[in-house]
Protein backbone atom coordinates (compact mmCIF):
# COMPACT_ATOMS: atom_id res chain seq x y z
CA UNK A 1 0.00 0.00 0.00
CA UNK A 2 1.27 3.46 -0.95
CA UNK A 3 0.61 5.97 1.84
CA UNK A 4 2.71 8.80 0.43
CA UNK A 5 1.18 11.88 -1.14
CA UNK A 6 1.58 12.22 -4.88
CA UNK A 7 0.65 14.84 -7.43
CA UNK A 8 -2.67 13.16 -8.19
CA UNK A 9 -6.24 13.79 -7.16
CA UNK A 10 -7.20 12.57 -3.70
CA UNK A 11 -10.74 11.26 -3.69
CA UNK A 12 -13.30 12.37 -1.16
CA UNK A 13 -16.36 10.73 0.31
CA UNK A 14 -19.83 11.89 -0.70
CA UNK A 15 -21.96 12.43 2.39
CA UNK A 16 -25.18 14.41 2.66
CA UNK A 17 -24.78 15.89 -0.81
CA UNK A 18 -21.22 17.16 -0.28
CA UNK A 19 -17.72 15.92 -1.07
CA UNK A 20 -15.89 15.63 2.24
CA UNK A 21 -12.42 14.49 3.30
CA UNK A 22 -12.16 11.09 4.93
CA UNK A 23 -11.04 10.99 8.54
CA UNK A 24 -7.89 9.03 7.82
CA UNK A 25 -4.22 9.39 7.03
CA UNK A 26 -4.10 6.15 5.04
CA UNK A 27 -4.53 6.10 1.27
CA UNK A 28 -3.80 3.81 -1.64
CA UNK A 29 -3.28 4.49 -5.30
CA UNK A 30 -5.82 3.86 -8.02
CA UNK A 31 -3.95 2.56 -11.08
CA UNK A 32 -4.62 2.29 -14.76
CA UNK A 33 -3.89 -1.45 -15.06
CA UNK A 34 -2.96 -1.14 -18.73
CA UNK A 35 -0.12 1.30 -18.05
CA UNK A 36 0.60 1.24 -14.33
CA UNK A 37 -0.06 4.99 -14.18
CA UNK A 38 -1.56 6.39 -10.98
CA UNK A 39 -5.02 7.85 -11.62
CA UNK A 40 -5.93 8.99 -8.11
CA UNK A 41 -5.52 8.32 -4.40
CA UNK A 42 -8.40 6.72 -2.56
CA UNK A 43 -8.76 7.06 1.22
CA UNK A 44 -9.09 4.16 3.59
CA UNK A 45 -12.00 5.69 5.44
CA UNK A 46 -12.90 4.70 8.98
CA UNK A 47 -15.97 3.52 10.85
CA UNK A 48 -16.39 7.15 11.90
CA UNK A 49 -16.84 8.09 8.24
CA UNK A 50 -19.42 5.32 7.93
CA UNK A 51 -21.24 6.67 10.98
CA UNK A 52 -21.35 10.15 9.43
CA UNK A 53 -22.86 8.71 6.26
CA UNK A 54 -25.42 6.73 8.25
CA UNK A 55 -26.46 9.84 10.16
CA UNK A 56 -27.01 11.69 6.89
CA UNK A 57 -28.85 8.77 5.32
CA UNK A 58 -31.04 8.26 8.37
CA UNK A 59 -32.12 11.91 8.36
CA UNK A 60 -32.72 11.87 4.61
CA UNK A 61 -34.85 8.73 4.96
CA UNK A 62 -37.39 10.59 7.09
CA UNK A 63 -38.24 12.77 4.09
CA UNK A 64 -37.38 10.50 1.15
CA UNK A 65 -39.70 7.68 2.25
CA UNK A 66 -42.59 10.18 2.13
CA UNK A 67 -41.81 11.39 -1.39
CA UNK A 68 -44.48 10.05 -3.72
CA UNK A 69 -43.50 6.99 -5.69
CA UNK A 70 -44.22 8.65 -9.07
CA UNK A 71 -41.98 11.58 -8.10
CA UNK A 72 -39.16 9.21 -7.20
CA UNK A 73 -39.68 7.52 -10.56
CA UNK A 74 -39.34 10.85 -12.38
CA UNK A 75 -35.93 11.40 -10.78
CA UNK A 76 -34.90 7.92 -11.95
CA UNK A 77 -36.09 8.73 -15.48
CA UNK A 78 -34.02 11.92 -15.48
CA UNK A 79 -31.03 9.96 -14.18
CA UNK A 80 -31.44 7.42 -16.97
CA UNK A 81 -31.39 10.19 -19.56
CA UNK A 82 -28.20 11.66 -18.10
CA UNK A 83 -26.51 8.26 -18.06
CA UNK A 84 -27.35 7.74 -21.73
CA UNK A 85 -25.94 11.17 -22.57
CA UNK A 86 -22.72 10.33 -20.70
CA UNK A 87 -22.43 6.66 -21.70
CA UNK A 88 -19.22 7.09 -23.70
CA UNK A 89 -17.62 9.19 -20.94
CA UNK A 90 -18.53 6.62 -18.30
CA UNK A 91 -17.19 3.85 -20.52
CA UNK A 92 -13.82 5.57 -20.76
CA UNK A 93 -13.66 5.92 -16.98
CA UNK A 94 -14.39 2.20 -16.61
CA UNK A 95 -11.68 1.30 -19.12
CA UNK A 96 -9.09 3.57 -17.52
CA UNK A 97 -9.55 2.22 -14.01
CA UNK A 98 -10.52 -1.38 -14.78
CA UNK A 99 -8.65 -2.16 -18.02
CA UNK A 100 -11.38 -3.83 -20.07
CA UNK A 101 -11.82 -2.81 -23.69
CA UNK A 102 -13.77 0.34 -24.41
CA UNK A 103 -16.41 -1.64 -26.29
CA UNK A 104 -16.94 -3.85 -23.25
CA UNK A 105 -16.95 -0.86 -20.92
CA UNK A 106 -19.56 1.04 -22.93
CA UNK A 107 -21.66 -2.13 -23.04
CA UNK A 108 -21.30 -2.44 -19.26
CA UNK A 109 -22.58 1.10 -18.86
CA UNK A 110 -25.53 0.09 -21.00
CA UNK A 111 -26.29 -2.81 -18.65
CA UNK A 112 -26.20 -0.42 -15.72
CA UNK A 113 -28.60 1.91 -17.50
CA UNK A 114 -31.00 -1.03 -17.97
CA UNK A 115 -31.12 -1.42 -14.20
CA UNK A 116 -31.96 2.25 -13.77
CA UNK A 117 -34.72 1.86 -16.36
CA UNK A 118 -36.13 -1.11 -14.45
CA UNK A 119 -36.02 0.83 -11.18
CA UNK A 120 -37.83 3.73 -12.85
CA UNK A 121 -40.81 1.40 -13.17
CA UNK A 122 -41.14 1.45 -9.39
CA UNK A 123 -44.81 2.58 -9.27
CA UNK A 124 -45.83 -0.76 -10.74
CA UNK A 125 -43.21 -2.71 -8.80
CA UNK A 126 -44.35 -1.25 -5.46
CA UNK A 127 -48.01 -2.15 -5.98
CA UNK A 128 -49.47 -4.30 -3.25
CA UNK A 129 -52.17 -6.96 -3.34
CA UNK A 130 -55.70 -6.98 -2.01
CA UNK A 131 -58.54 -9.39 -1.45
CA UNK A 132 -61.94 -7.79 -1.17
CA UNK A 133 -63.62 -10.53 0.83
CA UNK A 134 -61.61 -12.55 3.32
CA UNK A 135 -64.67 -12.80 5.56
CA UNK A 136 -68.07 -11.12 5.75
CA UNK A 137 -67.50 -7.38 5.20
CA UNK A 138 -63.74 -7.87 5.71
CA UNK A 139 -60.99 -7.12 3.20
CA UNK A 140 -57.20 -7.43 3.36
CA UNK A 141 -54.58 -5.33 1.59
CA UNK A 142 -50.82 -5.81 1.38
CA UNK A 143 -48.63 -2.66 1.18
CA UNK A 144 -44.89 -2.32 0.51
CA UNK A 145 -42.68 0.10 2.44
CA UNK A 146 -38.93 0.88 2.35
CA UNK A 147 -36.84 -0.59 5.14
CA UNK A 148 -34.52 2.36 5.86
CA UNK A 149 -30.78 2.87 5.45
CA UNK A 150 -29.16 0.15 3.34
CA UNK A 151 -25.59 -0.48 2.20
CA UNK A 152 -23.80 -1.85 -0.83
CA UNK A 153 -20.28 -3.27 -1.19
CA UNK A 154 -19.20 -3.62 -4.81
CA UNK A 155 -16.27 -5.25 -6.68
CA UNK A 156 -13.67 -3.93 -9.10
CA UNK A 157 -14.70 -5.91 -12.15
CA UNK A 158 -17.95 -4.08 -12.98
CA UNK A 159 -17.62 -0.61 -11.43
CA UNK A 160 -20.67 0.68 -13.33
CA UNK A 161 -23.05 -2.25 -13.60
CA UNK A 162 -22.88 -3.76 -10.12
CA UNK A 163 -23.53 -0.53 -8.18
CA UNK A 164 -26.51 -0.06 -10.51
CA UNK A 165 -27.82 -3.45 -9.42
CA UNK A 166 -28.14 -1.93 -5.97
CA UNK A 167 -28.70 1.75 -5.38
CA UNK A 168 -31.21 2.63 -8.14
CA UNK A 169 -33.75 0.08 -6.90
CA UNK A 170 -32.95 0.79 -3.26
CA UNK A 171 -33.65 4.51 -3.56
CA UNK A 172 -36.55 4.02 -5.99
CA UNK A 173 -38.33 1.95 -3.35
CA UNK A 174 -37.79 4.73 -0.80
CA UNK A 175 -34.62 3.71 1.02
CA UNK A 176 -31.43 5.69 1.47
CA UNK A 177 -28.11 4.16 0.48
CA UNK A 178 -24.44 3.98 1.46
CA UNK A 179 -22.11 2.68 -1.25
CA UNK A 180 -18.61 1.34 -0.68
CA UNK A 181 -17.11 0.91 -4.14
CA UNK A 182 -14.01 -1.17 -4.68
CA UNK A 183 -10.91 0.73 -3.66
CA UNK A 184 -9.37 -0.47 -6.94
CA UNK A 185 -12.06 1.15 -9.12
CA UNK A 186 -13.73 4.03 -7.24
CA UNK A 187 -13.77 6.63 -10.03
CA UNK A 188 -16.85 5.39 -11.86
CA UNK A 189 -18.97 5.60 -8.70
CA UNK A 190 -17.89 9.19 -8.18
CA UNK A 191 -19.29 10.13 -11.57
CA UNK A 192 -22.45 8.09 -11.00
CA UNK A 193 -23.31 10.00 -7.86
CA UNK A 194 -22.59 13.35 -9.52
CA UNK A 195 -25.06 12.57 -12.29
CA UNK A 196 -27.70 11.34 -9.84
CA UNK A 197 -27.36 14.58 -7.91
CA UNK A 198 -27.77 16.47 -11.19
CA UNK A 199 -30.96 14.48 -11.81
CA UNK A 200 -32.44 15.93 -8.62
CA UNK A 201 -31.73 13.29 -5.99
CA UNK A 202 -31.97 14.97 -2.56
CA UNK A 203 -28.96 15.25 -0.27
CA UNK A 204 -28.27 12.24 1.92
CA UNK A 205 -30.24 9.73 -0.16
CA UNK A 206 -27.10 8.32 -1.83
CA UNK A 207 -23.73 8.46 -0.07
CA UNK A 208 -20.28 7.09 -0.91
CA UNK A 209 -17.71 6.02 1.66
CA UNK A 210 -14.44 4.93 0.07
CA UNK A 211 -12.15 2.47 1.75
CA UNK A 212 -11.35 -1.12 2.55
CA UNK A 213 -11.95 -3.50 5.46
CA UNK A 214 -12.73 -0.82 8.08
CA UNK A 215 -15.54 0.53 5.92
CA UNK A 216 -16.87 -2.97 5.26
CA UNK A 217 -16.94 -3.72 8.98
CA UNK A 218 -18.44 -0.32 9.71
CA UNK A 219 -21.32 -1.07 7.36
CA UNK A 220 -21.78 -4.61 8.67
CA UNK A 221 -21.79 -3.54 12.31
CA UNK A 222 -23.78 -0.31 12.29
CA UNK A 223 -27.18 -0.88 13.94
CA UNK A 224 -29.01 1.62 11.73
CA UNK A 225 -28.10 -0.13 8.46
CA UNK A 226 -30.92 -2.56 7.81
CA UNK A 227 -29.72 -4.47 4.76
CA UNK A 228 -26.50 -5.11 2.86
CA UNK A 229 -25.89 -6.07 -0.77
CA UNK A 230 -22.50 -7.54 -1.63
CA UNK A 231 -20.79 -8.76 -4.79
CA UNK A 232 -17.29 -10.22 -4.61
CA UNK A 233 -15.29 -13.31 -3.75
CA UNK A 234 -16.61 -16.41 -2.00
CA UNK A 235 -14.35 -15.88 1.01
CA UNK A 236 -15.36 -12.27 1.60
CA UNK A 237 -18.99 -12.94 0.73
CA UNK A 238 -19.27 -15.64 3.37
CA UNK A 239 -17.69 -13.25 5.88
CA UNK A 240 -20.13 -10.47 4.94
CA UNK A 241 -23.09 -12.82 5.19
CA UNK A 242 -22.13 -14.20 8.59
CA UNK A 243 -21.16 -10.90 10.18
CA UNK A 244 -24.12 -9.03 8.74
CA UNK A 245 -26.52 -11.77 9.81
CA UNK A 246 -25.01 -11.76 13.30
CA UNK A 247 -26.16 -8.13 13.47
CA UNK A 248 -29.64 -9.18 12.30
CA UNK A 249 -29.41 -7.51 8.91
CA UNK A 250 -30.79 -8.67 5.61
CA UNK A 251 -27.84 -9.78 3.49
CA UNK A 252 -27.53 -10.79 -0.14
CA UNK A 253 -24.00 -11.89 -0.99
CA UNK A 254 -23.25 -12.77 -4.61
CA UNK A 255 -19.90 -14.50 -4.61
CA UNK A 256 -17.49 -16.71 -6.54
CA UNK A 257 -17.95 -18.75 -9.69
CA UNK A 258 -16.47 -21.66 -11.58
CA UNK A 259 -18.72 -21.73 -14.61
CA UNK A 260 -18.74 -24.78 -16.89
CA UNK A 261 -19.68 -24.66 -20.57
CA UNK A 262 -20.55 -27.90 -22.35
CA UNK A 263 -20.24 -28.36 -26.13
CA UNK A 264 -21.99 -31.38 -27.64
CA UNK A 265 -21.31 -33.05 -30.97
CA UNK A 266 -24.43 -31.58 -32.59
CA UNK A 267 -23.52 -27.98 -31.74
CA UNK A 268 -22.68 -25.24 -34.22
CA UNK A 269 -18.96 -25.29 -33.51
CA UNK A 270 -18.21 -21.90 -35.04
CA UNK A 271 -20.90 -20.25 -32.91
CA UNK A 272 -19.60 -22.09 -29.86
CA UNK A 273 -16.04 -20.92 -30.50
CA UNK A 274 -17.18 -17.33 -30.82
CA UNK A 275 -19.32 -17.46 -27.68
CA UNK A 276 -16.72 -19.15 -25.51
CA UNK A 277 -13.86 -16.91 -26.65
CA UNK A 278 -15.92 -13.95 -25.45
CA UNK A 279 -16.98 -15.68 -22.26
CA UNK A 280 -13.55 -17.00 -21.24
CA UNK A 281 -11.30 -14.12 -22.24
CA UNK A 282 -13.55 -11.05 -22.27
CA UNK A 283 -12.86 -8.67 -19.38
CA UNK A 284 -9.61 -10.64 -18.91
CA UNK A 285 -11.66 -13.44 -17.36
CA UNK A 286 -12.39 -11.21 -14.38
CA UNK A 287 -16.13 -11.71 -14.21
CA UNK A 288 -18.33 -14.08 -12.28
CA UNK A 289 -20.07 -15.29 -15.44
CA UNK A 290 -16.88 -16.19 -17.32
CA UNK A 291 -16.47 -19.71 -18.68
CA UNK A 292 -13.50 -21.09 -16.77
CA UNK A 293 -14.09 -24.80 -17.51
CA UNK A 294 -14.96 -26.13 -20.96
CA UNK A 295 -16.34 -29.66 -21.23
CA UNK A 296 -16.19 -31.09 -24.77
CA UNK A 297 -17.91 -34.20 -26.04
CA UNK A 298 -15.18 -36.61 -27.14
CA UNK A 299 -16.13 -36.96 -30.79
CA UNK A 300 -15.77 -33.25 -31.62
CA UNK A 301 -13.08 -32.30 -29.09
CA UNK A 302 -10.09 -32.30 -31.46
CA UNK A 303 -11.91 -30.39 -34.20
CA UNK A 304 -13.24 -27.84 -31.73
CA UNK A 305 -9.88 -27.31 -30.05
CA UNK A 306 -8.16 -26.61 -33.36
CA UNK A 307 -10.67 -23.86 -34.15
CA UNK A 308 -10.77 -22.51 -30.61
CA UNK A 309 -7.01 -22.37 -30.06
CA UNK A 310 -6.51 -20.49 -33.31
CA UNK A 311 -9.24 -18.01 -32.38
CA UNK A 312 -7.57 -17.44 -29.01
CA UNK A 313 -4.22 -16.83 -30.72
CA UNK A 314 -5.87 -14.20 -32.92
CA UNK A 315 -7.10 -12.11 -29.97
CA UNK A 316 -5.69 -8.58 -29.93
CA UNK A 317 -4.18 -7.72 -26.56
CA UNK A 318 -3.45 -4.24 -25.25
CA UNK A 319 -4.75 -1.02 -23.75
CA UNK A 320 -8.53 -1.12 -23.80
CA UNK A 321 -8.67 2.40 -25.22
CA UNK A 322 -6.84 1.29 -28.37
CA UNK A 323 -8.96 0.39 -31.38
CA UNK A 324 -9.58 -3.30 -31.93
CA UNK A 325 -8.28 -4.47 -28.56
CA UNK A 326 -10.27 -7.35 -27.09
CA UNK A 327 -8.21 -8.48 -24.11
CA UNK A 328 -6.95 -5.94 -21.60
CA UNK A 329 -4.97 -6.39 -18.39
CA UNK A 330 -5.94 -7.98 -15.11
CA UNK A 331 -6.60 -5.46 -12.39
CA UNK A 332 -3.32 -5.37 -10.41
CA UNK A 333 0.25 -6.63 -10.37
CA UNK A 334 -0.60 -9.10 -7.61
CA UNK A 335 -3.44 -10.50 -9.72
CA UNK A 336 -1.03 -10.93 -12.62
CA UNK A 337 1.49 -12.73 -10.42
CA UNK A 338 -1.25 -14.92 -8.95
CA UNK A 339 -2.37 -15.91 -12.44
CA UNK A 340 1.17 -16.74 -13.55
CA UNK A 341 1.52 -18.94 -10.46
CA UNK A 342 -1.70 -20.76 -11.38
CA UNK A 343 -0.31 -21.45 -14.85
CA UNK A 344 2.83 -22.95 -13.32
CA UNK A 345 0.72 -24.99 -10.90
CA UNK A 346 -1.37 -26.37 -13.75
CA UNK A 347 1.75 -27.61 -15.53
CA UNK A 348 3.20 -29.11 -12.33
CA UNK A 349 -0.04 -30.99 -11.61
CA UNK A 350 -0.02 -32.59 -15.07
CA UNK A 351 -2.37 -30.50 -17.20
CA UNK A 352 -1.36 -29.97 -20.83
CA UNK A 353 -0.60 -26.31 -21.58
CA UNK A 354 -2.03 -25.77 -25.06
CA UNK A 355 -1.69 -21.98 -25.12
CA UNK A 356 0.52 -20.09 -22.68
CA UNK A 357 -0.34 -16.45 -22.00
CA UNK A 358 2.55 -15.90 -19.60
CA UNK A 359 4.75 -14.19 -22.19
CA UNK A 360 2.38 -11.21 -22.38
CA UNK A 361 3.48 -10.22 -18.88
CA UNK A 362 6.86 -9.12 -20.28
CA UNK A 363 5.53 -7.29 -23.35
CA UNK A 364 3.62 -4.49 -21.62
CA UNK A 365 3.99 -1.93 -18.87
CA UNK A 366 0.65 -2.95 -17.37
CA UNK A 367 -0.60 -6.14 -15.78
CA UNK A 368 -1.22 -8.40 -18.75
CA UNK A 369 -1.74 -12.14 -19.13
CA UNK A 370 -2.61 -13.57 -22.53
CA UNK A 371 -5.26 -16.18 -23.27
CA UNK A 372 -4.23 -19.43 -21.62
CA UNK A 373 -5.68 -22.86 -22.36
CA UNK A 374 -5.12 -26.14 -20.52
CA UNK A 375 -6.22 -29.58 -21.70
CA UNK A 376 -6.23 -32.92 -19.89
CA UNK A 377 -7.48 -31.18 -16.75
CA UNK A 378 -8.76 -33.36 -13.90
CA UNK A 379 -11.25 -32.39 -11.21
CA UNK A 380 -8.67 -32.83 -8.45
CA UNK A 381 -6.39 -30.16 -9.95
CA UNK A 382 -6.02 -26.70 -8.47
CA UNK A 383 -6.80 -24.95 -11.75
CA UNK A 384 -10.13 -26.79 -11.95
CA UNK A 385 -11.12 -26.10 -8.37
CA UNK A 386 -10.02 -22.51 -7.70
CA UNK A 387 -11.70 -19.41 -9.03
CA UNK A 388 -8.70 -17.90 -10.82
CA UNK A 389 -10.51 -14.79 -12.09
CA UNK A 390 -8.17 -14.60 -15.06
CA UNK A 391 -8.04 -15.43 -18.80
CA UNK A 392 -7.26 -19.08 -18.10
CA UNK A 393 -9.46 -21.89 -19.43
CA UNK A 394 -9.44 -25.53 -18.33
CA UNK A 395 -10.65 -28.09 -20.89
CA UNK A 396 -12.07 -31.50 -19.96
CA UNK A 397 -13.48 -34.18 -22.25
CA UNK A 398 -16.64 -36.21 -21.62
CA UNK A 399 -18.28 -39.10 -23.46
CA UNK A 400 -21.80 -37.66 -23.25
CA UNK A 401 -24.04 -35.02 -21.68
CA UNK A 402 -24.75 -36.87 -18.40
CA UNK A 403 -21.02 -37.22 -17.74
CA UNK A 404 -20.44 -33.56 -18.62
CA UNK A 405 -23.20 -32.45 -16.25
CA UNK A 406 -21.82 -34.67 -13.49
CA UNK A 407 -18.40 -33.02 -13.88
CA UNK A 408 -19.92 -29.54 -13.61
CA UNK A 409 -22.04 -30.47 -10.60
CA UNK A 410 -18.93 -31.47 -8.67
CA UNK A 411 -18.04 -27.80 -8.20
CA UNK A 412 -19.20 -26.00 -5.06
CA UNK A 413 -19.44 -22.77 -7.06
CA UNK A 414 -22.58 -22.64 -9.17
CA UNK A 415 -23.25 -19.21 -10.59
CA UNK A 416 -23.89 -20.30 -14.15
CA UNK A 417 -23.44 -22.96 -16.81
CA UNK A 418 -23.86 -23.05 -20.58
CA UNK A 419 -24.69 -25.67 -23.18
CA UNK A 420 -24.09 -25.58 -26.93
CA UNK A 421 -26.32 -28.06 -28.75
CA UNK A 422 -28.99 -28.40 -31.42
CA UNK A 423 -31.02 -30.91 -29.42
CA UNK A 424 -34.17 -29.95 -27.53
CA UNK A 425 -33.92 -33.14 -25.50
CA UNK A 426 -30.35 -32.27 -24.47
CA UNK A 427 -31.44 -28.77 -23.49
CA UNK A 428 -34.17 -30.15 -21.25
CA UNK A 429 -31.81 -32.67 -19.65
CA UNK A 430 -29.28 -29.92 -19.01
CA UNK A 431 -31.88 -27.57 -17.55
CA UNK A 432 -33.31 -30.19 -15.21
CA UNK A 433 -30.03 -31.73 -14.02
CA UNK A 434 -27.38 -29.00 -13.84
CA UNK A 435 -26.84 -27.47 -10.40
CA UNK A 436 -26.40 -23.80 -11.26
CA UNK A 437 -28.56 -20.72 -11.06
CA UNK A 438 -28.13 -19.07 -14.46
CA UNK A 439 -28.09 -21.19 -17.59
CA UNK A 440 -27.11 -20.30 -21.13
CA UNK A 441 -28.26 -22.18 -24.21
CA UNK A 442 -26.07 -21.57 -27.27
CA UNK A 443 -24.53 -18.48 -25.72
CA UNK A 444 -21.47 -17.98 -23.56
CA UNK A 445 -22.50 -15.46 -20.90
CA UNK A 446 -25.93 -16.19 -19.39
CA UNK A 447 -26.12 -13.04 -17.28
CA UNK A 448 -29.82 -12.12 -17.13
CA UNK A 449 -31.25 -8.71 -17.95
CA UNK A 450 -32.40 -6.44 -15.14
CA UNK A 451 -35.92 -7.87 -14.90
CA UNK A 452 -34.66 -11.34 -13.88
CA UNK A 453 -32.74 -12.23 -10.70
CA UNK A 454 -29.00 -12.86 -10.71
CA UNK A 455 -29.50 -16.26 -9.15
CA UNK A 456 -26.33 -18.13 -8.23
CA UNK A 457 -26.52 -21.44 -6.33
CA UNK A 458 -24.39 -23.25 -3.74
CA UNK A 459 -21.40 -21.20 -2.56
CA UNK A 460 -21.95 -18.63 -5.30
CA UNK A 461 -24.69 -17.02 -3.22
CA UNK A 462 -25.38 -16.49 0.46
CA UNK A 463 -28.81 -15.19 1.34
CA UNK A 464 -32.42 -15.64 0.33
CA UNK A 465 -33.30 -12.85 -2.09
CA UNK A 466 -31.12 -12.30 -5.15
CA UNK A 467 -30.15 -9.07 -6.88
CA UNK A 468 -32.22 -7.76 -9.80
CA UNK A 469 -35.76 -8.49 -10.86
CA UNK A 470 -38.59 -8.82 -8.39
CA UNK A 471 -36.16 -10.24 -5.84
CA UNK A 472 -34.55 -6.82 -5.52
CA UNK A 473 -37.92 -5.19 -4.81
CA UNK A 474 -38.57 -7.75 -2.08
CA UNK A 475 -35.08 -7.28 -0.66
CA UNK A 476 -35.40 -3.52 -0.27
CA UNK A 477 -38.97 -3.47 1.07
CA UNK A 478 -41.06 -4.91 3.85
CA UNK A 479 -44.79 -5.35 3.96
CA UNK A 480 -47.81 -4.37 5.98
CA UNK A 481 -51.01 -6.34 5.68
CA UNK A 482 -54.09 -4.36 6.70
CA UNK A 483 -57.21 -6.33 7.49
CA UNK A 484 -60.30 -4.12 7.77
CA UNK A 485 -63.97 -4.66 8.57
CA UNK A 486 -66.49 -2.37 6.89
CA UNK A 487 -69.87 -2.99 8.52
CA UNK A 488 -72.47 -3.11 5.77
CA UNK A 489 -75.54 -3.61 8.01
CA UNK A 490 -76.54 0.06 7.81
CA UNK A 491 -77.27 -0.39 4.12
CA UNK A 492 -79.65 -3.28 4.62
Curated annotation (Swiss-Prot):
One of its GO terms (molecular function) is methylmalonate-semialdehyde dehydrogenase (acylating, NAD) activity. The lineage of its organism: Bacteria, Bacillati, Bacillota, Bacilli, Lactobacillales. Pathway: Polyol metabolism; myo-inositol degradation into acetyl-CoA; acetyl-CoA from myo-inositol: step 7/7. Homotetramer. Keywords: NAD, Oxidoreductase. The keyword Ligase does not apply. The active site is at residue 288. It comes from the Bacteria. Belongs to the aldehyde dehydrogenase family. IolA subfamily. The keyword Metal-binding does not apply. It comes from Lacticaseibacillus casei (Lactobacillus casei). It catalyses: 3-oxopropanoate + NAD(+) + CoA + H2O = hydrogencarbonate + acetyl-CoA + NADH + H(+); 2-methyl-3-oxopropanoate + NAD(+) + CoA + H2O = propanoyl-CoA + hydrogencarbonate + NADH + H(+). NAD(+) binds at residues 156, 180, 183-184, 233, 255, 387. This is Malonate-semialdehyde dehydrogenase. Its EC number is 1.2.1.27. It holds the Pfam family Aldedh. GO terms for biological process: inositol catabolic process; thymine catabolic process; valine catabolic process. InterPro entries: Ald_DH/histidinol_DH, Ald_DH_C, Ald_DH_CS_CYS, Ald_DH_N, Aldehyde_DH_dom, MeMal-semiAld_DH, MSDH_GmP_bac. Catalyzes the oxidation of malonate semialdehyde (MSA) and methylmalonate semialdehyde (MMSA) into acetyl-CoA and propanoyl-CoA, respectively. Is involved in a myo-inositol catabolic pathway. Bicarbonate, and not CO2, is the end-product of the enzymatic reaction. Transmembrane segments: none annotated. It is an enzyme of class 1 (oxidoreductase).
Amino acid sequence: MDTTKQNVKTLKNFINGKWVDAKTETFENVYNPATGDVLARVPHSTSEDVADAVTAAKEAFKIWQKVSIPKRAKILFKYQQLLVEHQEELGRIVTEENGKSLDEAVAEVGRGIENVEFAAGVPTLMMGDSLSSVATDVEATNYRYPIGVVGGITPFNFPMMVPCWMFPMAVATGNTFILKPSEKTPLTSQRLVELFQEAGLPDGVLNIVNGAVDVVNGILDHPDIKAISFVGSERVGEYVYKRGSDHLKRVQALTGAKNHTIVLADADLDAAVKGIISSSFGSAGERCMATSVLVLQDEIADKFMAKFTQAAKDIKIGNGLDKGVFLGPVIRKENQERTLNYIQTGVKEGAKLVLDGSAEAKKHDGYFVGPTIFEDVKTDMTIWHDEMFAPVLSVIRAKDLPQAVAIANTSELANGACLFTDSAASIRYFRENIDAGMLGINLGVPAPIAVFPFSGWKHSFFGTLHANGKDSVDFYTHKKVVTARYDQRRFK
